Amino acid sequence: MIYEGKAITVKALESGIVELNFDLKGESVNKFNRLTLNELRASVDAIKADGSIKGVIVTSGKDVFIVGADITEFVDNFKLPDEELVAGNLEANKIFSDFEDLAVPTVVAINGIALGGGFEMCLAGDYRVMSETAKIGLPEVKLGIYPGFGGTVRLPRVIGTDNAVEWIASGKENKAADALKVGAVDAVVAPAKLKEAALDLVKRAISGELDYKAKRQPKLEKLKLNAIEQMMCFETAKGFVAGQAGPNYPAPVEAIKTIQKAANFGRDKALEVEAAGFVKLAKTSVAESLIGLFLNDQELKKKAKHHDEIARDVKLAAVLGAGIMGGGIAYQSASKGTPILMKDIREEGIQMGLTEASKLLGKRVEKGRMTPAKMAEALNAIRPTMSYGDFGNVDIVVEAVVENPKVKQIVLAEVEDVVREDAILASNTSTISISLLAQALKRPENFVGMHFFNPVHMMPLVEVIRGEKSSEVAVATTVAYAKKMGKNPIVVNDCPGFLVNRVLFPYFGGFSKLLGFGVDFVRIDKVMEKFGWPMGPAYLSDVVGIDTGHHGRDVMAEGFPDRMAVEGKTAVDVMYEANRLGQKNGKGFYAYETDKRGKPKKVSDPEAYELLKSIVVEEREVTDEDIINFMMIPLCLETVRCLEDGIVDTAAEADMGLIYGIGFPPFRGGALRYIDSIGVAEFVALADKYADLGALYHPTAKLREMAAKGQKFFG
């Protein structure tokens, strides 16, 4: 053994060839933490010191190659002063450069996922052989940063600037065939042949059949683009990517600027340019928020995994109530491998559900994400029925009938009598108390809420609601089923609106107050979209449905009368009374026309403005900042209350619920991280400025206590 550590070993194979193997002890994946980096330094030094070594192959002892840097460790480094962070980055890069400069040929065998620092390690090798099933990429822009271990330097010199810009700015994962096509790897082989192929390649380089020094040289030099080519390539790319990423996500454009700045430098000077830009991005609030989201997501996955220990396997599911929602749930279940019965009392409902599922599956085939054979298999896994005849073998039933407590109770009691005693019942309700619905059941311990968001196939969140009598097995089984469906489940406790809708309606309450002061809803939409929301509150109301919002508002007002009760008529009331229900009937705050692609397109409608005149209580001048505060303060304070009331267990879950469920701007990190970014004391003072607007704007006693103590929700 030439070197033996806890993350890396270097051992002799044959004919002067050694194998550098990444296999981090005690972990399921390889990642670049401090230990691995230190051992890579020691491994490279050991190889350099051994004159008998003629070639190196790099392998992994895990199912993945290397998933990237250990964010939990490196995020602490981002708090260091700039010069220390730059120095640390360059020190790490020196390890990769020393590996690249070894006096012998190097071949990297990519057996599985190689992302971020993992792929940057691959780029430092002379040759790369990739398994057919592996994926490679540089996803750092999704964390608000860009590659920091030489990715912006080596990738353009390996696959060309245009391809590198696309890979780095998009952060996408790339399959083996695509990687081979652009020259990111030199060969693609079956998984079982990978090591053999790597050995063959290194032997050919040792024998001189392949000129590894010539292969290495372009990575050490400046980019082969003249001034005009550089200008055309970089300026066009910056313009296009800026348009795609928007002003709130600077990392993709900064990555292109870095490649451009380093274009005329050799490797070592180019790495200095990369390090300087990397540090600049690492210090931004966007990076802090997006890295925070990544860590929150990891925390959620760990919690969801914990549920697996007691969850029952779901081999057959059922959905009650077909239609668009039922069809969406059936599609999601069947397309992810769980057969499902779809029951409705009406033939039209069944037909609508099947049409929805078929349409969604057809779109996947059109986009090349599914074969026609797989589509047929998924459609066959949806079994439409108008009776309970086959329900005896069902493991979980998702009730998705009309949002009416009496109807839901009747349907749930009915299905409870025909399923096995251990079958789980789950209600897809958005506002109705799970404990209330459970009163109709003989086995309330087997009952939970399972709130899908519309459209089911697009929205990643599922709220799993624990009622007063819900068992942990019922909760765990529902969480496991949601994960199996490809969703991100969050467990919340029962209350009106649960987490997401309870937080969303105070946001709409702020919108209602602005309209009462005569503020133009189009202006409000523009301000909130600029703030980072995918759509403003007026447009969102139309998309959700004014009738849905009206009903939800009444449920929330009944649940929290101290702050959500409504005095007098509101915009939602006048729209509802005028039968302006939003996109579903072509008119709400906006009117809707069909565009060339058959999609609804919003246009201004004088009738809406006329209706809204009746609910103006006083004309008030407000700034754009006021609009943001009117909307965001109630949302943030209600999120705080949900955490304090134990509706959600952690700040991470609360924030991820809002990101996944209502499209909270990811670059702001979630409601609680948004408060942290302002400062808890500063946020409390800001809320107090709007105290005259009512209880929705009044901070809790505990939040005031946090402000006084200088505490934060994160860190």
Curated annotation (Swiss-Prot):
Gene Ontology molecular-function annotations: 3-hydroxybutyryl-CoA epimerase activity; delta(3)-delta(2)-enoyl-CoA isomerase activity; enoyl-CoA hydratase activity; long-chain-3-hydroxyacyl-CoA dehydrogenase activity; NAD+ binding
Residues covered by region (3-hydroxyacyl-CoA dehydrogenase): 312-715
Annotated region (Enoyl-CoA hydratase/isomerase), positions in chain: 1-190
Lipid metabolism as UniProt keyword: yes
InterPro entries membership: 3-OHacyl-CoA_DH_CS (IPR006180), 3-OHacyl-CoA_DH_NAD-bd (IPR006176), 3HC_DH_C (IPR006108), 6-PGluconate_DH-like_C_sf (IPR008927), ClpP/crotonase-like_dom_sf (IPR029045), Enoyl-CoA_hydra/iso (IPR001753), FA_oxidation_alpha_subunit (IPR050136), FadB (IPR012799)
Substrates-to-products reaction catalysed: a (3S)-3-hydroxyacyl-CoA + NAD(+) = a 3-oxoacyl-CoA + NADH + H(+); a (3S)-3-hydroxyacyl-CoA = a (2E)-enoyl-CoA + H2O; a 4-saturated-(3S)-3-hydroxyacyl-CoA = a (3E)-enoyl-CoA + H2O; (3S)-3-hydroxybutanoyl-CoA = (3R)-3-hydroxybutanoyl-CoA
GO biological process, alphabetically ordered: fatty acid beta-oxidation
Keywords, sorted A to Z: Fatty acid metabolism, Isomerase, Lipid degradation, Lipid metabolism, Lyase, Multifunctional enzyme, NAD, Oxidoreductase
Residues involved in substrate binding: 297, 501, 660
Binding positions (NAD(+)): 325, 344, 401-403, 408, 430, 454
EC number: 4.2.1.17, 5.1.2.3, 5.3.3.8, 1.1.1.35
Transmembrane feature ranges: none
GO cellular component, one term: fatty acid beta-oxidation multienzyme complex
Active-site residues, as the UniProt record annotates them: 451
Sites annotated Important for catalytic activity: 120, 140
Pathway stated in the Swiss-Prot or TrEMBL entry: Lipid metabolism; fatty acid beta-oxidation
Record text on subunit structure and interactions: Heterotetramer of two alpha chains (FadB) and two beta chains (FadA).
PANTHER family: TRIFUNCTIONAL ENZYME SUBUNIT ALPHA, TRIFUNCTIONAL ENZYME SUBUNIT ALPHA, MITOCHONDRIAL
Physiological role: Involved in the aerobic and anaerobic degradation of long-chain fatty acids via beta-oxidation cycle. Catalyzes the formation of 3-oxoacyl-CoA from enoyl-CoA via L-3-hydroxyacyl-CoA. It can also use D-3-hydroxyacyl-CoA and cis-3-enoyl-CoA as substrate.
HAMAP family linked to this entry: FadB
Family: In the N-terminal section; belongs to the enoyl-CoA hydratase/isomerase family.
Identification of the protein by name: Fatty acid oxidation complex subunit alpha
Species assigned in the record: Ectopseudomonas mendocina (strain ymp) (Pseudomonas mendocina)
